[in-house]
């Protein structure tokens, strides 16, 4: 059985104390003597010690020497126990240095635009006025006779990305079979409600722009829709017949902000 060489012989194979040289494949290089004992004794008895300079040393050479010494020791010893993961981990931790891996990600990249949940519904204000598309981009509130109830707008209410708080649920309101969504924009200094045409290949989506998003709040048997972009501004109707639906800031007054919602079957 092969025997482990004496530590002094192992050291002399790589280091000359007299000339302060570290011998490499390409020839000797002058180095200042500053040595350290590296202990591989965790593998068992018969420790092997290796002297390596801390200044101007070749890191790759040190790794090669470490591997050679470790493997020679493993080959030369007859182990009483099975080689375990901890033994390999001890060798690898001696050879390699751990460095943290930093991942840089953008929160926007983490947003998932998977299938958007939505429901179809109709809205009437508390005065039972229906919402009707009067022209391509104008939504009005008026009383409809029973034979004209088919004129009522059917909304596709999508549940979108946003903060849910105080029973307020972020939603977007699109018109069924139309590429139109209710949105809030500022005209002058006043927030205004409008119908905005969108690309059907893109909308609806989970991460809707804030101008499209409203907080839906249920109050008894009615619902309110508050603009996320302009807090305390609500989808409103007028007491006057056939007036456009608008964005108002007064609740419980002349402006009507509460609606009855009828959910339709899929």
Curated annotation (Swiss-Prot):
Protein name stated in the entry: Interleukin-1 beta
Residue ranges annotated as propeptide in the record: 1-113
Cited Pfam families: IL1 (PF00340), IL1_propep (PF02394)
Keywords for the protein's UniProt record, in alphabetical order: Cytokine, Cytoplasm, Inflammatory response, Lysosome, Mitogen, Pyrogen, Secreted
InterPro entries associated with the record: IL-1_CS, IL-1_fam, IL-1_propep, IL1/FGF
Main location: cytoplasm
PROSITE patterns: INTERLEUKIN_1
Quaternary context: Monomer. In its precursor form, weakly interacts with full-length MEFV; the mature cytokine does not interact at all. Interacts with integrins ITGAV:ITGBV and ITGA5:ITGB1; integrin-binding is required for IL1B signaling. Interacts with cargo receptor TMED10; the interaction is direct and is required for the secretion of IL1B mature form. Interacts with HSP90AB1; the interaction facilitates cargo translocation into the ERGIC. Interacts with HSP90B1; the interaction facilitates cargo translocation into the ERGIC.
Subcellular localization(s) per the UniProt record: Cytoplasm, Cytosol; Secreted; Lysosome; Secreted, Extracellular exosome
GO term, biological process aspect, one: immune response
The gene coding this protein: IL1B
Cross-referenced CDD domains: beta-trefoil_IL1B
Positions marked as site (Important for interaction with integrin): 168, 178, 187, 201
A molecular function GO annotation: cytokine activity
Function comment: Potent pro-inflammatory cytokine. Initially discovered as the major endogenous pyrogen, induces prostaglandin synthesis, neutrophil influx and activation, T-cell activation and cytokine production, B-cell activation and antibody production, and fibroblast proliferation and collagen production. Promotes Th17 differentiation of T-cells. Synergizes with IL12/interleukin-12 to induce IFNG synthesis from T-helper 1 (Th1) cells. Plays a role in angiogenesis by inducing VEGF production synergistically with TNF and IL6.
């Amino acid at each position: 059985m092969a025997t482990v060489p004496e530590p002094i012989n192992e050291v002399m194979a790589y280091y000359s104390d007299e000339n302060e040289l570290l011998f490499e494949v390409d020839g000797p290089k002058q180095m200042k003597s500053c040595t350290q004992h590296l202990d591989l004794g965790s593998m068992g008895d018969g420790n092997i010690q290796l002297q390596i300079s801390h200044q101007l040393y070749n890191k790759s050479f040190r790794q090669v020497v470490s591997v050679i010494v470790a493997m020679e020791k493993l080959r030369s010893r007859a182990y009483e126990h099975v080689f375990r993961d901890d033994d390999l981990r001890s060798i690898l931790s001696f050879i390699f240095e751990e460095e943290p891996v930093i991942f840089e990600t953008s929160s926007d990249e983490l947003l998932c635009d998977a299938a958007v949940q939505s429901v179809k519904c109709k809205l009437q204000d508390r005065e039972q006025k229906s919402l009707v598309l009067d022209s391509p981009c104008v939504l009005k509130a008026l009383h409809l006779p029973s034979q004209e109830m088919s004129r009522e707008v059917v909304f596709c209410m999508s549940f979108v990305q946003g903060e849910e708080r105080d029973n307020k649920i972020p939603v977007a309101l699109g018109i069924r079979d139309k590429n139109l969504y209710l949105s809030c924009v500022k005209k002058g200094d006043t927030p205004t409600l409008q119908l905005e045409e969108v690309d059907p290949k893109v909308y609806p989506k989970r991460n809707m722009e804030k101008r499209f998003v409203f907080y839906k709040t249920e109050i008894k048997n009615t619902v309110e829709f508050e603009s996320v972009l302009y807090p305390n501004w609500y989808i409103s109707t007028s007491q006057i017949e056939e007036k456009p639906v608008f964005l108002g800031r007064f609740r419980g007054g002349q402006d009507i902000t509460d609606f009855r919602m009828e959910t339709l079957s899929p």
